[in-house]
């Protein structure tokens, strides 16, 4: 075996299509472009989104809504997740990060009322939903907004 006699496996490589090289090639004359029409001409590509004169989709759909620049994004923690902490402990941002409840605090932490809380805790966060606040106080815990 020599390097100059190596050949690729059968079916591994394809011959490229040589277009416009005479009728005997099978791809001569119109060079696979068909007869006349916009796409047969040189530079005859159609713009992306063009729908043949019909009003294009991006202009048919309404321009609605906006994203507020000053929107605050809160990391969410549910009450059922707070049950990990011991009774009477103070649950603040650092405690939540250490236990893995919150990875990154963007604009703050919001406590939501999903699930049940069985222990009296002192919870410190930026925001609380009304039902979460009620559930924490009903168990005997305290709520502190930072």
Swiss-Prot record:
One of its GO terms (cellular component) is cytosolic large ribosomal subunit. SUPFAM superfamilies: Ribosomal proteins L15p and L18e. The keyword rRNA-binding applies. This is Large ribosomal subunit protein uL15. Gene3D superfamilies: 3.100.10.10. The gene is rplO. Part of the 50S ribosomal subunit. Residues 1-61 are annotated as: Disordered. InterPro entries: Ribosomal_uL15, Ribosomal_uL15/eL18, Ribosomal_uL15/eL18_sf, Ribosomal_uL15_bac-type, Ribosomal_uL15_CS.
